[in-house]
Amino acid sequence: MHKQTKGCILLLLCAMIWGAAFVAQSEGMQYVGPFTMGATRFFLAGLVLLPVIRVLDRKGWSQNRPATKEDKKRQLAAGAICGVLLFAATTLQQFGLLDTTVGKSGFVTALYIVFVPIVGVLTGKKAGLRVWLCAAAAVFGMYLLCVGSGFSVAGGDLLTLGCAVLFTFHICYISAVSPRMDGVRLSCVQFFVCSALSAIGMFVFESPDWASIRSCWLPIVYAGVFSGGVAYTFQIIGERDVQPALASLLMSLESVFAALFGWILIGQGLSGRELIGCAIMFAAILLSQLPERKTAG
């Protein structure tokens, strides 16, 4: 099999796994609270990446592996900051899922893809006209998807929008530090930090018990092991042989799979108006990722 074809298949599987994870998160919270879900799933995700790091080191595939104590300190510090941002974003997403559907959550969360180049303007990066048009289209699509009669918006949709904004800053920070870091180690640290912060919220605001956690072991294991460890590993391997623009397009299908699995697995369908909103948002997401055409001279 051609390397790029294999990479595309891995990235498509990655998007499918992440899309189904929205269902796992939603179903898991029928038994445990958002903080408990976060603490358990991200702890498992961190554990799964430990052997992945070991294998990558043995194969010589690790990139920017920390060689000195200073490198390790910088890696831990960057991972901690990523973990705080990930905790804030996923906590809003978890609470949002209590008051919105899986499909809506998937598409609204995916707005970070449109937001990232806009935030880049703050750091001196230019955003072309197409990016702003895509942002406007995404806002209109979100209006069709989330705004009901009487201009009412579900609280869960607003929380998920906040999640998308936080994921935007999370991605921008990773983009700034990742060229100097080992990506898998960075992710492993952020998972454990996110789990620790979620555990604090779990013990302060919730009343976790092993019976409830055991009752939703499958959603927790799926969200932690598959969405965290397996999908992330697929992403790392797949992106090696696929052009960045194509990789982003494939992974943005996560929102489509979230809506599809929400409908198939738990019967959360979307109305015609909401489907049109999804289509507009997805088109905006795709167009925002296409490379800018270079002008001659």
Residue ranges and their predicted role:
Residues A15, G38-T40, S105-L111, I174-S195, ...:
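Helix-helix packing/entry segments at the starts of transmembrane helices
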Residues A45-L49, V116-P117, S152-E206, F234:
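Transmembrane alpha-helical segments that form core, pore/gating elements
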Residues F42, L50-P51, D57-R58, C216-L218, ...:
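C-terminal-most transmembrane helix of multi-pass membrane proteins
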Residues L49, A127-V147, F167, S198, ...:
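Hydrophobic transmembrane alpha-helices of multi-pass small-molecule transport proteins
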Residues G19, V23, G83, F87, ...:
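Hydrophobic/small/kink-forming positions within alpha-helical transmembrane segments
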